[in-house]
A protein has these predicted regions:
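Acidic/aromatic-lined carbohydrate-recognition and catalytic surfaces
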Residues: 2-214
Length: 214
């Protein structure tokens, strides 16, 4: 992020990835810790905040070998905001806290993915309770971000085939046979919707932070 840029002035900047900031359970999230960080940058008159890609990582935790150029890593989801905005039931807060406390003494990619999956399941539990306005915003977002359907289908297929490389998948999926893909989408509506919901919330939270910084 570059704040109030003027080419005739000197600027200072800092490189810090959001995952390195405090907050969240397994790494920094798009929550209050980032807002606090932006406030500190402003107080110190640091104009530029540079960070590494926010995309989902590979099995080794690298964002440079990501399954998507557009998607955001689910690890960054801010649960507190989801609860506050009624996207997750308040009653689930204790459940999330218990899971975090039990599993997150040290950082593990597998555990981080498991908790992201749990958050996705909780979002699905509350989906039918969302207002028409919120569902409409989600649908409009999906229409304006056509990549998210292909990404969601791809990720459900990747899980089906034990996260193997796509070129090792059955022929009908490897070459994106239209009828095979349509059948897959029809039979996997909920898993695909869950991934879309996660990406929508990530994008929504990130844009709020960007606006706050600007």
């Amino acid at each position: 992020m570059l704040l109030n840029f003027d080419p005739l002035k000197k600027y200072s900047g800092i490189l810090v990835h959001p995952s390195s900031l405090p907050g969240g359970s397994y790494c920094g999230t798009f929550g209050n810790s980032i807002r606090d960080w932006i406030e500190i940058l402003s107080i110190c008159k640091i104009n530029t905040w540079q960070f590494l890609p926010l995309s989902p990582t590979d099995s080794m935790g690298s964002p440079y070998s990501s399954p998507s150029s557009f998607a955001i890593n689910p690890w960054f989801l801010d649960v507190d905001e989801l609860i506050k905005s009624n996207y997750i039931k308040q009653s689930h807060q204790a459940k999330i806290f218990q899971l975090e406390s039990a599993k997150l003494n040290i950082f593990q990619f597998k555990v981080a993915d498991e908790l992201s999956e749990i958050i996705g399941n909780l979002l699905m539990d509350s989906w039918h309770l969302l207002s028409f306005d919120k569902k409409d915003k989600f649908n409009v977002w999906c229409e304006n971000n056509s990549w998210v359907n292909d990404f969601s289908v791809f990720m459900t297929l990747k899980e089906k085939f034990d996260f193997s490389a796509w070129w090792n998948w059955p022929e009908e999926f490897k070459y994106k046979n239209k009828y095979a893909i349509e059948k897959w989408e029809k039979n996997n509506v909920k898993p695909i919707l869950k991934i879309k919901l996660i990406q929508w919330h990530l994008d929504r939270q990130w844009l709020k932070l960007k606006k706050f910084a600007e």
